């Protein structure tokens, strides 16, 4: 048991309805990926709920508002506090349970695709295409008018990639570099969204188109090749 947090100036207290489950949460449960200094040791990087109280100076929210939050931690508790700027309303027609799992992947994908400058007609290579980030990246890229080539490690996951918008799905146990080249008429991918790090670096470079862009958002394959 821990005390219900008190919102400080500029903060909002939210009664939790649902929380997302991310890889970072699973790692913290196993004793890895510790929270930054000064951040609660209660896990949970995204959650949804109802505003219970507001701190001094808060103008965007009122008690009773439904909100979704991106957090440094604390989303798995019955109540959490967050700066008012880290809260957004749930999308129209989306319930709080579903909305709780949107912000982390959405922020990751949208910000990194903005950095990469993905354009209409280009090809995005997504590693881990059946995961939360991979699925959202596929759908977001399609909304921009881009084509998606995704990698995954099993038949069900490859099917998931295809049914969620990937033009081509490649088994990463095979020669996916050749698969990317074939899918792009020999050009290679214009943008790569990579979660593996050093393990895939050499192959990613081979799979890139001339003047392509690669964004590394994870190091699941380590920092050394």
Where are these regions (language model features)?
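Glycine-rich phosphate-binding loop and adjacent beta-alpha segment
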Residues: 152, 161, 196-225
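A glycine-rich helix->loop->beta "capping" turn
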Residues: 183-191
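N-terminal Rossmann-like NAD(P) cofactor-binding module of classical short-chain dehydrogenase/reductase
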Residues: 68, 125, 170, 192-193
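Short glycine-centered segments of the SAM/dcSAM-binding site in methyltransferase folds
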Residues: 66, 123, 147, 191, ...
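Glycine-rich beta-strand-centered segment in the early N-terminal region that forms part
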Residues: 3-21, 32-74
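Cytochrome P450 core scaffold surrounding the K-helix E-X-X-R motif
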Residues: 24-30
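NAD(P)H dinucleotide-binding glycine-rich loop of Rossmann-like/cofactor-binding domains
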Residues: 27, 60, 66-128, 163
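Mid-domain Rossmann-like dinucleotide-binding core that forms the NAD(H)/NADP(H) cofactor-binding site
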Residues: 100-174, 179
């Amino acid at each position: 048991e821990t005390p219900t947090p008190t919102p400080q100036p500029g903060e909002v207290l939210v009664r939790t309805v649902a929380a997302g489950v991310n890889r970072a949460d699973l790692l913290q449960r196993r004793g890895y990926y510790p929270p930054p200094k000064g951040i609660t040791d209660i896990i949970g990087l995204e959650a949804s709920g109802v505003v219970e109280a507001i701190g001094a100076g808060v103008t965007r929210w009122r008690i009773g508002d439904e909100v979704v939050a991106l957090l440094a931690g604390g989303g798995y508790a019955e109540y959490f506090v967050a700066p008012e700027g880290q809260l957004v309303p749930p999308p129209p027609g989306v319930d709080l349970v579903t909305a709780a799992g949107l912000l982390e992947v959405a922020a990751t994908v949208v910000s990194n695709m903005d950095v990469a400058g993905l354009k209409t007609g280009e090809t995005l290579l997504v590693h881990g295409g059946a995961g939360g980030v991979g699925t959202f990246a596929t759908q977001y890229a399609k909304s921009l008018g881009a084509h998606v080539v995704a990698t995954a490690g099993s038949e069900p996951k490859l099917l998931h990639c295809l049914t969620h918008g990937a033009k081509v799905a490649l088994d990463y146990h095979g020669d996916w570099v050749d698969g990317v080249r074939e899918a792009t008429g020999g050009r290679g991918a214009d943008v790569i969204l990579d979660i593996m790090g050093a393990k895939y670096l050499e192959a990613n470079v081979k799979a890139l188109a001339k003047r392509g862009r690669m964004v590394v958002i994870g190091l699941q394959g380590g920092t050394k090749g």
